[in-house]
């Protein structure tokens, strides 16, 4: 079964309600200057990957599908320096502490073992790194998707599933009526110095 094809179709439907990638990234940045390495985990068609190059020095797209990665390499803009790697189940070949920001768009519901996945996220984040998660808000319109309730993940459930002694919830990001963002960090004390 080609789950990537199903994921691509639902992603295309959902993106019809999504603001431009640059607007989403700026909302997560919240007037704070970022640099360093941005990892787009579950990069799919590169919607956020390529746009993030405006704000970060190094950009890496990660996806399970080698076909997706090959397509991104074939079609990426000439000006792009983004790198792409394939993840294997819950791991990547990236070194420990390589990410200033890890970004994910609507992939948590597709991950069977969230704890194992979070372990890899924590390994990849720098000590002051941040995890940015963009999810679909269940609304009356449901974004026009023919989706069951398990397509959506409520904010509270997302926070409960991810936060632990090493990953701390920072804030909600109001994207629009159809999407919400959530920020986590490994080091709450370091993060608070910037605010």
Which residues does each PLM region occupy?
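C-terminal lobe and adjacent flexible extensions of AdoMet/dcAdoMet transferase-like proteins
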Residues: 183-195
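A short glycine-rich, Lys/Arg-flanked "PGG" loop and its adjoining helix->strand segment in the class I
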Residues: 115-130
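C-terminal alpha-helical "lid/dimerization" subdomain adjacent to the S-adenosyl-L-methionine
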Residues: 4-5, 9-18, 130-183
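A short SAM/SAH-binding and catalytic strip from SAM-dependent methyltransferases
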Residues: 100-113
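Conserved alpha-helix/loop element of class I SAM-dependent methyltransferases that forms part
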Residues: 17-36
């Amino acid at each position: 079964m080609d789950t990537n094809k199903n994921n691509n179709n639902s992603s295309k439907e959902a993106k019809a309600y999504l603001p431009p990638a640059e607007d989403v990234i700026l909302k997560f940045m919240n007037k704070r200057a970022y640099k360093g390495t941005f990892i787009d985990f579950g990069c799919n068609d590169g919607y956020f990957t390529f746009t993030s190059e405006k704000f970060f020095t190094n950009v890496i797209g990660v996806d399970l599908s080698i076909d997706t990665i090959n397509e991104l390499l074939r079609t990426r803009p000439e000006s792009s320096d983004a790198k792409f790697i394939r993840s294997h189940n819950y791991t990547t070949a990236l070194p420990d502490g390589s990410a200033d920001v890890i970004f994910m768009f609507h992939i948590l519901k597709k991950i069977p073992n969230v704890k194992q996945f979070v372990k890899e996220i924590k390994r990849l984040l720098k000590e002051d790194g941040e995890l940015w998660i963009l999810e679909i808000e269940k609304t009356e319109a449901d974004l026009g998707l023919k989706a069951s309730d398990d397509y959506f993940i409520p904010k509270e459930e997302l926070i409960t599933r991810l936060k632990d002694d090493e990953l701390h919830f920072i804030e909600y990001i109001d994207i629009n009526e159809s999407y919400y963002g959530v920020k986590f960090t490994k080091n709450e004390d370091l993060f608070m110095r910037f605010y």
